Amino acid sequence: MASKEILFDVKAREKLSRGVDKLANAVKVTLGPKGRNVVIEKSFGSPVITKDGVTVAKEIELEDKFENMGAQMVKEVASKTSDIAGDGTTTATILAQAIYREGVKLVAAGRSPMAIKRGIDKAVEKLVKELGTLAKPTRDQKEIAQIGTISANSDTTIGNIIAEAMAKVGKEGVITVEEAKGLETTLEVVEGMQFDRGYLSPYFVTDPEKMICELDEPFILCNEKKISSMKDMLPVLEQVAKMNRPLVIIAEDVEGEALATLVVNKLRGTLQVVAVKAPGFGDRRKAMLQDIAVLTGGTVVSEDMGVKLENISVADLGTAKRVVVDKENTTIVDGAGKSEDIKARVKQIRAQIDETTSDYDREKLQERLAKLVGGVAVINVGAATETEMKEKKDRVEDALNATRAAVEEGIVPGGGTAYIRISRVLDDVKPADDDEAAGVNIIRRAIEEPLRQISSNAGYEGSIVVEKVRDGKDGFGFNAASGEFEDLIKAGVIDPKKVTRIALQNAASVASLLLTTECAIAEKPEAKKDMPMPGGGMGGMGGMGGMY
């Protein structure tokens, strides 16, 4: 086991503090509309240029192990804020730095770190409550566009596209971000339920020009197992053919004799049909087939449920207004399922979302929910170069997260103003002693820091701006983009309340933990051993004197 180096008291906090500052100083140059970019070297490919706080934080590893501990703790603040709120990572980092910097001075002066932590916790609790009263719900598409614009670094195109996407697919809808082939950033909305499986044979195509199969008012058969024999399917096929309606077969697979017979019947014009593989795998496939059945008003043919393919009738099939199948995707538009059945299914999926502990499962459940109730929107991000594409995609994802947070918990004045507005409630906090009061004062000073930094990045004196904003009321604040003092809500400079809240809570949590640290332990760097000198001469060749 490698030997350890142990630092105590002032020395430990000093090293941690240096690490915190190195990371925070790299991150905070990105804050606000006039914030700068950071360029990050990559071991392969072109460098990344970003204005996203968490991307910068994640790249930082310091050589000194104790300094690195401090940096990693603050990195945790940025990551956690990004995971929960999706934005506000730079604000959270700046708050953590300010809380720790002020706290370290007081601990060095002999104050009790545990009492300071209690004071910090009381102050944050009070501020979070007040933030709730300051927040207003998002009223319209315009406000959503403003939030998206601010989070995307004042890019109105991105803000408007996100607002349009949210208007089309609703709160429950899924919005994904993809890389576009061209330079334009566009929005594509898929109506109805879409899943990523296409036709099993190109012979099913009805439009050879577009290479798609489009069926109007089709019956939809959902089968859990493979279909390889024709005899099981014959009864239901005959019933559908008599009614002269198209048929969509969604099964684990359709192969051999069954697929060949379907293709022949399609080519002869006996039956308009298309066969598609079921989406997903394992239990998720069963659940998705059930979703399709509920949406279309059909029944899943499953031996687990005691339903066999040879015994089903047309009454067990679902229907929809239209089904479009291409090489890679199937879209079911306007399924004929009963609204109460769909609502019950949605309620069940929501309960599963609340219960699951896996982020992956939650994401997949939300996708299923969106397909049932909302829809799916795809934002195709276009750019001239790969470097610009990465940077733009980051901004779109940030903006998307911020708008979701705003819809969830409402909005507050942006640009660091919300923290200044709520700071007055700190006068009502009742600390138990002077050390707790010092903790409250740390927060009072720290929450001014985001506004100071935004002003500083825009080329203004932070202290003057803070005083002027403090003298104002409600939404009055500093618009760093224009350099004006105005009503920020009217000017469209707004932040999601959730982002503002999470940034403060996470920053206070990690910074106060760092403050209560008295000892730091890290592995000693191994002393580099000098390489041994190569042996001289050609030893071992004696005894050759007898050669002439």
Curated annotation (Swiss-Prot):
<feature type="binding site">
    <location>
        <begin position="479"/>
        <end position="481"/>
    </location>
    <ligand>
        <name>ATP</name>
    </ligand>
</feature>
<feature type="binding site">
    <location>
        <position position="495"/>
    </location>
    <ligand>
        <name>ATP</name>
    </ligand>
</feature>
<feature type="binding site">
    <location>
        <begin position="87"/>
        <end position="91"/>
    </location>
    <ligand>
        <name>ATP</name>
    </ligand>
</feature>
<dbReference type="GO" id="GO:0005737">
    <property type="term" value="C:cytoplasm"/>
</dbReference>
<dbReference type="InterPro" id="IPR027413">
    <property type="entry name" value="GROEL-like_equatorial_sf"/>
</dbReference>
<dbReference type="InterPro" id="IPR018370">
    <property type="entry name" value="Chaperonin_Cpn60_CS"/>
</dbReference>
<dbReference type="GO" id="GO:0016853">
    <property type="term" value="F:isomerase activity"/>
</dbReference>
<dbReference type="InterPro" id="IPR002423">
    <property type="entry name" value="Cpn60/GroEL/TCP-1"/>
</dbReference>
<feature type="binding site">
    <location>
        <position position="415"/>
    </location>
    <ligand>
        <name>ATP</name>
    </ligand>
</feature>
<dbReference type="InterPro" id="IPR027409">
    <property type="entry name" value="GroEL-like_apical_dom_sf"/>
</dbReference>
<comment type="similarity">
    <text>Belongs to the chaperonin (HSP60) family.</text>
</comment>
<protein>
    <recommendedName>
        <fullName>Chaperonin GroEL</fullName>
        <ecNumber>5.6.1.7</ecNumber>
    </recommendedName>
</protein>
<dbReference type="GO" id="GO:0051082">
    <property type="term" value="F:unfolded protein binding"/>
</dbReference>
<dbReference type="InterPro" id="IPR027410">
    <property type="entry name" value="TCP-1-like_intermed_sf"/>
</dbReference>
<dbReference type="GO" id="GO:0042026">
    <property type="term" value="P:protein refolding"/>
</dbReference>
<keyword id="KW-0547">Nucleotide-binding</keyword>
<dbReference type="InterPro" id="IPR001844">
    <property type="entry name" value="Cpn60/GroEL"/>
</dbReference>
<comment type="function">
    <text>Together with its co-chaperonin GroES, plays an essential role in assisting protein folding. The GroEL-GroES system forms a nano-cage that allows encapsulation of the non-native substrate proteins and provides a physical environment optimized to promote and accelerate protein folding.</text>
</comment>
<keyword id="KW-0067">ATP-binding</keyword>
<keyword id="KW-0143">Chaperone</keyword>
<dbReference type="GO" id="GO:0005524">
    <property type="term" value="F:ATP binding"/>
</dbReference>
<dbReference type="GO" id="GO:0140662">
    <property type="term" value="F:ATP-dependent protein folding chaperone"/>
</dbReference>
<dbReference type="Pfam" id="PF00118">
    <property type="entry name" value="Cpn60_TCP1"/>
</dbReference>
<feature type="binding site">
    <location>
        <position position="51"/>
    </location>
    <ligand>
        <name>ATP</name>
    </ligand>
</feature>
<comment type="subunit">
    <text>Forms a cylinder of 14 subunits composed of two heptameric rings stacked back-to-back. Interacts with the co-chaperonin GroES.</text>
</comment>
<keyword id="KW-0963">Cytoplasm</keyword>
<keyword id="KW-0413">Isomerase</keyword>
<feature type="binding site">
    <location>
        <begin position="30"/>
        <end position="33"/>
    </location>
    <ligand>
        <name>ATP</name>
    </ligand>
</feature>
